[in-house]
Amino acid sequence: MTLRQTLEQQWQDGGALATALRPLGALTGKVARWRRRHIQGRAASIPTIVVGNLGVGGSGKTPLVAALARQLTVAGWRVAIVSRGYGARPPHWPYRVQRDDSPQQAGDEPLLLAQEQGQTQAVYLCPDRHRAIAAAAADGYNLALLDDGFQHLALQPSLRLLVLSGPRPLGNGHCLPAGPLRECPDAMLHADALLMDAAAAAAIPERNGPPRFLFRIQPKDLVAVNDPCRSRSLDSLQGQHVTAVTGIARPQRFVASLEGLGAIPDPRFFPDHHSFCASDIAHLPRPLVMTAKDAVKCREFAQADDWTLRIEAELEASSQPWLEQSLLPWRS
C-alpha cells in the first residue's frame, strides 16, 4: 500500500496516524486562510471561470468542465479551457493541446478534454494561468474556463465554481495531511456557486451561502479504446464479467458504476495519473473496461475488446440562466 493509500484509509477510518497529523492539518488551514486574506490576484483580459474543489482526489470536475464548455458555447461564448498541465511535457509554455498529442506531451485530462470538445473549444496549458489565458485571448477566445484553480490566488477570476461530490464531500473535515482538504470547509464561502451531486447536497445542510446547482454524472455508452467509431450499448454489460482497469483518484466509484450497469467487474487498480504501458494490460482477461481518462493513455496498444465507459455530466437547467446573468457585465 502506498503512502497516499495509507493516508486515505486513515482519513476514512479516523486512524491514529490521521489523528497525530491534526496539528499539521491545522497549520495547513491557517496558511490557506492567510493566503486568501493577503494575496490579491489580478484579473485577466477576458472573463474567467474557475472550476475547482476543496479536497484532493476526484470529484467529477473534468466532466463538469466539459459540460460547462458546451453550455457556454451554446450561449455564444468562444471558450478556451485552461489547465496547469500537471505531468505534461509540452515543447513550450503556454501550449495549445492538439487532438493527436501524446498523453505524455499534453497530460491525460487536458488531452481528454481536447479530444472530447472537438473544434469549437481549445485547451491551453501553462502553470502560469495568466500566460495561458493571454494566449487564448490572442487566438480569439473570449472566455477562459479553468480546470482546477480554486486555490490559484494569483488570478482574480470572474466566477468561482466549487465542485462537491459524494456522501463525504469534505472528508473528515481536516486539512492535509490529517485529511483530504486543501483549505478549511469555510472556504466554500469564497465560491460564487456550489456544484453538487445528490449525495453531497444531502450531506451538507443548506444555509445562507453561495447558490447550489445539482449535477449528475451519467454513463452514455461503451466506445472501443482503439477505434472511437466503434461503440456498444450499456445494456451489453448486463451479466458480463469484465476487467475494470483504472488509474484514477477514486477507483471504487468506477467499479460501482459498472456494477450499477449490471456488469460483474474484476477490479485492477493503478495509481492516480498512472502512465500506462502495453505490459500493464496485455495479459489481463478480456473484455476490459476503463475510464476515458485512462483510455487516452492506452489507445496505441489497446486490443479489440478494450472499451471506454463514456460519461457526461449534466447540470440542472437553472444553472444556465444563472451563468448568463453572472456573465452579463462581460458581454460586449
UniProtKB/Swiss-Prot annotation:
SUPFAM superfamilies reported for this sequence: P-loop containing nucleoside triphosphate hydrolases
Pfam families: LpxK
Pathway this chain belongs to: Glycolipid biosynthesis; lipid IV(A) biosynthesis; lipid IV(A) from (3R)-3-hydroxytetradecanoyl-[acyl-carrier-protein] and UDP-N-acetyl-alpha-D-glucosamine: step 6/6
A Gene Ontology biological process term: lipopolysaccharide core region biosynthetic process
Domain of life: Bacteria
This protein's UniProt keywords: ATP-binding, Kinase, Lipid A biosynthesis, Lipid biosynthesis, Lipid metabolism, Nucleotide-binding, Transferase
One GO CC term, this protein: plasma membrane
GO molecular function, one term: tetraacyldisaccharide 4'-kinase activity
EC class: transferase
Its EC number(s): 2.7.1.130
Catalytic activity: a lipid A disaccharide + ATP = a lipid IVA + ADP + H(+)
Amino-acid positions noted as binding ATP in the UniProt annotation, renumbered to this chain: 55-62
Function summary: Transfers the gamma-phosphate of ATP to the 4'-position of a tetraacyldisaccharide 1-phosphate intermediate (termed DS-1-P) to form tetraacyldisaccharide 1,4'-bis-phosphate (lipid IVA).
Assigned protein family: Belongs to the LpxK family.
Protein name: Tetraacyldisaccharide 4'-kinase
